Amino acid sequence: MAIAKYSLTALDCPDPVALANFYSKITDFEVVVAHLSKNGDPLWVELVDNGVTKIAFQRVKNYVKPTWPEGPIPQQAHLDFDVPNLDIAEEKLLQIGAVKSPIQTSSDPADNFRVYFDPAGHPFCLVSNTSITDL
């Protein structure tokens, strides 16, 4: 029997609105500012799809980007996004501010995923899934 029900994944960042907008361009989910500080700065921003929060972004003072694949500030989580064509999706990602990691876990062009960084430095992956037909 489950102890709890999974709710969402939240990413720490210096600017939750900017990071939510970045991921909204990838997913087409709605950006919702959920919590403001006393001076009106967004503290918690959510990506919502059909009324369900999927990803949240939390403002963290003195945020430091993770280093990937190794380094003094290790990644603690990453997101995967399925796409029908890696090359087409990569072109679109780079246009909205993603950075392709200079280090890929394999140099085999037949691999089915690629690693990128979002504007706050979190690594995320595109995963080839040719069964997707609605993008």
Residue ranges and their predicted role:
Residues 71-93:
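Mid-chain, well-packed structural core segment of small domains
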Residues 51-71, 78-81:
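Conserved, structured core segments of small domains
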Residues 2-3, 10-55, 88-89, 94-117:
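Core segments of cupin and vicinal oxygen chelate
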Residues 6-8, 77-78:
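Short active-site oxyanion
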Residues 131-135:
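A short, polar/charged loop-to-alpha-helix boundary motif
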